[in-house]
Amino acid sequence: MGALLTILAEVFELATATGLSAEAILTGEAFTTAELLQAHIANLVEVGELSVAEALAATEVTSEAFEALQSISSVLPTAFIGVAATEGAILGSLITLTATSSALYPSTWKHSTPSANLNQEMALVPYIGDLDIFFPGAETISRFVYSIDPFRWASYLYNIVGRAVWEHLFRETRRQIAYHTTDIAGRTAQSIHHTIANFLENVRWTVSHLGTNLYSGLHNYYRQLPPLNPPQSRELARRLGVPQPDRQIFEKGEEGMKHPVSAEYVEKYGAPGGAEQRVAPDWLLPLLLGLYGDLTPAWEAEVEEEENEQDEEEYEPPQKRIKRTAKSSSKVNNKRGDRSARSPYRTRQHNHN
């Protein structure tokens, strides 16, 4: 087998160097081509009085390819056929011997058809994983020790390796999907924050005053309205012979000027010195930094102060327990009290015999 592989390796190297196919080298066509090329080069050297390098350049053949063609032997196809026949006979005898011994060996293993394969119309086979009761991998080890069929160990090993590869790919796929999903969500949030910040930087800001009282706003609106509606104004103008008012006059006024804008625009300044950097006014800077996750020192101090106030409101110090002592009672008279039913202030009577 080693000789056959060596010859094949040499054939592929010659095919790469000469530009000929491996089939041409094995069939002997390359040897005929090499002889014709050598004869043509020799003719150019002798008749044309050229050097070998000039003859190779005239025939557009490199020196490496010419040397490789000279190394091709005419007996290469015969040697390859002999080696291949010898290897084929050896491998055939080994395969025959293996098949005979496998057939004559008494097999005690039962290979019953699984119940899942009895249903030929079923497209998928249900998979039930190993139930490792003692420790992870116990069923796999016990199967290797007690349940390996020596005649089908290759297919069983292929099944185990395929299952391990599939489980690894499944876990890796889930991990990659979770990672990329989180990454996309983070980048999307960053892009949204960046878009909002650019919008707030480039937008035109105005300072306006909103009415605090709805009724006062309605009062001013109706007070500024003309006393006549548009049809009455046109009829009055037609009778007086003056130009009839139209929509533009109502919107722009009698002098053709627009009403003043009810707001003041914030002047926008560019980057100093033409640096083309991002600029923002001071009152807008905390909002932009907050979108990017940063806080100014003043804003951070205010946030910490509010958090401390909330913590103090939520935290209630435990009330001190006051130890109550028993009230001092009046002293008890040591004299024995009168327990009889008679009056304690009775007079004693003495019996005189």
UniProtKB/Swiss-Prot annotation:
Region DNA-binding, residue ranges: 302-353
Segments of this protein annotated with the region D1: 262-297
Span list, region Disordered: 301-353
Entry annotated with the keyword Transmembrane: yes
Keyword annotations of the record: Capsid protein, DNA-binding, Host endoplasmic reticulum, Host membrane, Host nucleus, Late protein, Lipoprotein, Membrane, Myristate, Transmembrane, Transmembrane helix, Viral penetration into host nucleus, Virion, Virus entry into host cell
Placement of sequence motif Nuclear localization signal: 318-327
Annotated GO MF terms: DNA binding; structural molecule activity
GO cellular component, one term: host cell nucleus
Pfam families: Polyoma_coat2
Biased composition (Acidic residues): 301-316
Chain ranges passing through the membrane: 279-299
Residues lipid-modified (N-myristoyl glycine): 2
Domain of life: Viruses
A Gene Ontology biological process term: viral penetration into host nucleus
Similarity-based family: Belongs to the polyomaviruses capsid protein VP2 family.
Name of the featured protein: Minor capsid protein VP2
Organism: Bovine polyomavirus (BPyV)
